C-alpha cells in the first residue's frame, strides 16, 4: 500500500493545514487509511520524511506497527538547524499556495514552525522515547544534509531492537540488490 502524503508537492492528495498538529495530522491520515482498509497491524517502510512519520506512528500506535524500515531517514544536525524549515518555506510553501488558493504563506510559516520547531534529532520523538521502542526496526542510513548518517546511527544505537544495513547501500549500484534482499528478509522475518 502506497500512501499519498497530504499536500505534498507533485501529489494529488490535498487537505487542510492543521497548523497546531502538523505531524499528528499526517499520522491521523496514515492510521485512517489503514482503518479504512480494515488493517489492524502492519509493517511500514518510509523514506526521508517517512522516518519521522514512522517514529510518530510508533509513539501513537505502537501496538499496530509490527516492524518498520526507515530508509534514508530525515534528521536534524546541530550544523544544519533550520534546513527543513528553510527548504520548505522556499519550495513546498509557495508551490502549495499556488495549488491551493485558500492557503497562505503565513499559514505555511506557522505550520512549518510547529513541524520543525523541535529542530533536533528526528523531529517527532525524543532520544528517551527511542530507547523504549520495542518494535523491530531496520535503518538504511544515508549521509546528505537532510538524511544525516550520525542521526540514523544514533537511532540504531538507542533503539533496542534495531538493525542497520550496510552503508553506503545505494552506491555502487551493485549494492542496491543486497540492501533490497536485506529489507525483504527483515520484513519476512517480522510479518
Regions flagged by a language model, labelled:
Residues 12-27:
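Catalytic nucleophile-loop/oxyanion-hole region of alpha/beta-hydrolase
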Residues 73, 78-133:
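The alpha/beta-hydrolase serine catalytic core
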Residues 24-42:
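Conserved acidic catalytic loop of the alpha/beta-hydrolase fold
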Residues 1-12:
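Conserved alpha/beta-hydrolase
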Residues 40-76:
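Conserved hydrolase catalytic core segment
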Amino acid at each position: 500500500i502506497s500512501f499519498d502524503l497530504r499536500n505534498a508537492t507533485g501529489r494529488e492528495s490535498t487537505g487542510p493545514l492543521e497548523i497546531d498538529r502538523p505531524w499528528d495530522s499526517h499520522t491521523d491520515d496514515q492510521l485512517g487509511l489503514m482503518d479504512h482498509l480494515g488493517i489492524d497491524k502492519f509493517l511500514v517502510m518510509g523514506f526521508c520524511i517517512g522516518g519521522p512519520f514512522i517514529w510518530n506512528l510508533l509513539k501513537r500506535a505502537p501496538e499496530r506497527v509490527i516492524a518498520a524500515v526507515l530508509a534514508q531517514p530525515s534528521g536534524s544536525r546541530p550544523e544544519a538547524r533550520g534546513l527543513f524549515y528553510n527548504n520548505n518555506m522556499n519550495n513546498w510553501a509557495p508551490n502549495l499556495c499556488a495549488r491551493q488558493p485558500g492557503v497562505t504563506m503565513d499559514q505555511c510559516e506557522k505550520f512549518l514552525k510547529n513541524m520543525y520547531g523541535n529542530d533536533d534529532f528526528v523531529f517527532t520523538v525524543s532520544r528517551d522515547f527511542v530507547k523504549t521502542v520495542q518494535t523491530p526496526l531496520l535503518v538504511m542510513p544515508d549521509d546528505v544534509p537532510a538524511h544525516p548518517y550520525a542521526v540514523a546511527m544514533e537511532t540504531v544505537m538507542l533503539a533496542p531492537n534495531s538493525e542497520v544495513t550496510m552503508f553506503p547501500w545505494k552506491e555502487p549500484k551493485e549494492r542496491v540488490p543486497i540492501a533490497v534482499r536485506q529489507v525483504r528478509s527483515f520484513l519476512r522475518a517480522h510479518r
